[in-house]
Each structure stands twice: as structure tokens, then as C-alpha cells.
């Protein structure tokens, strides 16, 4: 069994985002094997995330992107929700939202359901979101998804405040328009 040092605990914490005690328990259970400890943490995190699934996740952020296509342009927008704005505004959450958007673009997804089944590295977006829920310690879900195509597409992203990521995104194509917003809606 390898010695479980503070440096080893720190390394696994940075890689997984898990708490110090959880990392120490996982390393002890894995007899110092870092890869096995990470797998134990991931499995426990996904199990815990499943328990949070019934909670409301209505805070969040929206990422959007316009890409050129053979017939013009296509705009994609993905809303990723968490339980609190505290999590939604963290750089890691915003970065993960951008990653999910990238998976939508790569898969040329047409709906949130298609996005959840899309490849995310060596897994699916659905499993990546479950792993993110374990990392953030909150229920995380893909909220709204929109795709719009036309000769030309423009996107407007609105922030509720300067420190928050976009919470309202409007996309307009030469002959169509759509609007995404995080809850509560501007109409509430």
C-alpha cells in the first residue's frame, strides 16, 4: 500500500473537486491507488447526485455560439441549470456550460434529448452532467436548448448583473427568431 500523503490528497482533490475527507477515505479504500480512488469518488458522487435529482434546478447560465455551414449559419444555445446562483456563476460551471455547448455543436444536436445522448469525450453528455452534479454538489441539468439556422444568425446574450453569466439569450436568423432564458422568466 502506498503512503497517503498530504500532497497525494491535494492532487486528487484538485483533480476531482471532492472534499478532503472523501479523498482520504477513497485513497485508503483504494490502498493509495490514485486512479482507483478517483473512480471511487466518481461513483460515490454520481450516487449522491442521483439523490439530488428531485431538487429544483432553476438557476443557471446560457452559452451560445454561431457556426458557419454550407447553407449559411447555425446558432446553438444551451441552458445549464443548478440549484443556486452561487454555483451557476462559478468559473467552472460557466466553463462546463461552454463544454456542453461544444458537444451540441459537434453532434449538430437538434433537441435537448439529442444533446444528452451526444458524445462527451469517452462518455455521453448525460453522464458528464451527472458527474458535474457530483462535482458541484447540487442538482445540475440541461435546461433549454435551441438551434436556429439561416443565411445569417445573430445572438444577443443578456446578463442580470455584471458578475453573473448570461441568463437570457436571443437568437435571430434571417427568417426566424428564438429566445432562451433561465428561470424565473422575464414574464414572471
Spans of features found by a protein language model:
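N-terminal assembly/interaction segments in proteins that build large macromolecular machines
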Residues: 2-183, 187
Amino acid at each position: 500500500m502506498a503512503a497517503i500523503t498530504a500532497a497525494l490528497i491535494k492532487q486528487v482533490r484538485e483533480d476531482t473537486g471532492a472534499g478532503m475527507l472523501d479523498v482520504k477515505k477513497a485513497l485508503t479504500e483504494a490502498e493509495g491507488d490514485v486512479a482507483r480512488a478517483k473512480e471511487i469518488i466518481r461513483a460515490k458522487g454520481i450516487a449522491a447526485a442521483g439523490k439530488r435529482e428531485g431538487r429544483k434546478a432553476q438557476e443557471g447560465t446560457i452559452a451560445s455560439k454561431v457556426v458557419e455551414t454550407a447553407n449559411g449559419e447555425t446558432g446553438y444555445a444551451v441552458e445549464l441549470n443548478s440549484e443556486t446562483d452561487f454555483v451557476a456563476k462559478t468559473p467552472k460551471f460557466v466553463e462546463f456550460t461552454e463544454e456542453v455547448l461544444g458537444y451540441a455543436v459537434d453532434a449538430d444536436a437538434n433537441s435537448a434529448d439529442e444533446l444528452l445522448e451526444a458524445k462527451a469525450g469517452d462518455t455521453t453528455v448525460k453522464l458528464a452532467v451527472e458527474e458535474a452534479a457530483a462535482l458541484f454538489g447540487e442538482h445540475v441539468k440541461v435546461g433549454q436548448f435551441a438551434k436556429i439556422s439561416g443565411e445569417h444568425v445573430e445572438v444577443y446574450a443578456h446578463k442580470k448583473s455584471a458578475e453573473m453569466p448570461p441568463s437570457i439569450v436571443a437568437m435571430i436568423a434571417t427568417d426566424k427568431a428564438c429566445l432562451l432564458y433561465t428561470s424565473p422568466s422575464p414574464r414572471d
